[in-house]
Regions:
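PRPP-associated nucleotide enzymes
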Residues: 1-377
Length: 377
């Protein structure tokens, strides 16, 4: 399948962010905008092929950046034959984790972390770390992570690479990374300076604040243990086995009917790839069914009535992971079935109520909640 730059690129405005007021929103990424999971994974596979071709003969650790690029990193690990290990960065507090800290200065949540547990042993067996992103603007956040890795593991002189769907680094920054022997691979390069916004900034609408309390939807709850957390460095074989196991147990339990022709699979915050993969498998097994996937997000983005703008509705939620944490879900609409897939070990029930309210307010009546718990086998 061939993709054009216009397929991957729309521009939106961050809510109350003066450091970097605009961001690229990829309609095929499956984060903010509902996307066909099969098409999203085909796109990510193209990036995985670039990684595989670039680093032939090397053993790689693929790291997906939270929050938006965790599924991209997982897909690179899944499809690139030379990836031996996979993990993601995180903003979560994980029991028993030791962290490497660095910052993402332009973000709505500046603190980023990489879990150090098991990383030193992994580094002894690989040749290179490849960071996977949706879009790289300056590369400064990745550079900070590299510096922290070098500081923490000085005896491990590993090489590094960057793989992104879109790259908008200046020629100067690209040259800098080349001089540092850090390869940059991407599907498209764009010049931010020549980009036009193409939307009317006078048509902003207020986000809808979803409320707590009793809801009309009572989700069917399914809980599976996996004893695995993608935020910890994981051998690829184990990662793939965990995903395959979820597919084998969850899909029969869904008991999908012929009347459920339009389905949304919704991930939560950093947790995307297993849910996206589930959506793709549902499509494969039920070819007459239309499946869409996206995920809740911490990122606050403006919404607009302008038809040329990518985001039209925003429901403000409380997180399933933590009381008081604000999250958002964009561009909800009506489906025959909504399947929420989360790795929240202890779900914040008040947060779940806000999400169910938002789903209900867009005309949805049927919901399944899948908890893929990493704290039990």
């Amino acid at each position: 399948m061939k993709f054009e730059l216009t397929d991957l690129l729309t521009i939106a405005k961050r809510d109350n962010n003066t450091l970097r007021p605009y961001l690229f929103v990829n309609p095929l990424q499956g984060k903010h905008i509902p996307a066909d999971p099969k098409v999203s994974l085909q796109l990510f596979r193209l990036l995985a092929q670039k990684v595989e071709q670039r680093y032939q003969g090397e053993r790689l650790l693929a790291i997906g950046f939270a929050e938006t690029a965790t599924a991209i990193g997982a897909a690179v690990a899944w499809y690139a034959e030379n990836v031996a290990y996979y993990m993601t960065t995180t903003r979560e507090d994980i029991a028993g984790a030791e962290y490497l800290h660095f910052t993402e200065s332009h973000s709505h949540a500046t603190d980023q972390r990489l879990i150090a547990n098991g990383l030193e042993d992994c580094l002894e067996t690989i040749d290179r770390i490849v960071f996977a992103e949706d879009e790289v603007t300056t590369g400064s956040t990745i550079e900070k992570c590299i510096n922290e890795l070098r500081r923490r593991f000085p005896a491990s002189a590993k090489r590094f690479g960057i793989a992104s769907l879109v790259n908008s680094m200046s020629d100067q920054r690209l040259s800098y990374f080349s001089e540092q022997d850090i390869s940059c691979d991407y599907l498209y390069h764009i010049d931010r300076e020549t980009m036009s916004w193409g939307f009317d900034e006078n048509q902003w609408v207020e986000p809808h604040k979803s409320v707590k309390g009793a809801v009309e939807i009572v989700p069917t709850r399914m809980t599976y243990g996996n004893g695995w957390d993608e935020r910890f460095v994981t051998p690829k074989a184990q990662f793939k086995d965990k995903i395959d196991t979820l597919m084998k147990v969850a899909i029969p339990d869904l008991a999908l009917t012929a009347a459920q022709r339009k389905i949304l699979v919704l991930g939560t915050e950093e947790f995307m790839f297993p849910a996206m993969f589930l959506g793709m498998r549902i499509e494969e097994l039920h070819p007459d069914t239309t499946v869409r996937f996206h995920a809740t997000s911490r990122s606050p983005i403006m919404v607009s009535e302008d038809v040329n703008y990518p985001l039209h509705t925003r429901s403000e939620l409380e997180s399933l992971y933590e009381k008081g944490r604000k999250t958002n879900v964009y561009n909800l609409c009506k489906y025959d079935l909504v399947i929420i897939v989360t790795d929240a070990c202890e779900i914040n029930e008040e947060g779940l109520q806000t999400l169910l309210h938002a789903i209900c307010e867009h005309g949805n009546k049927n919901c399944i909640l899948i908890r893929w718990r990493n704290d039990v086998p």
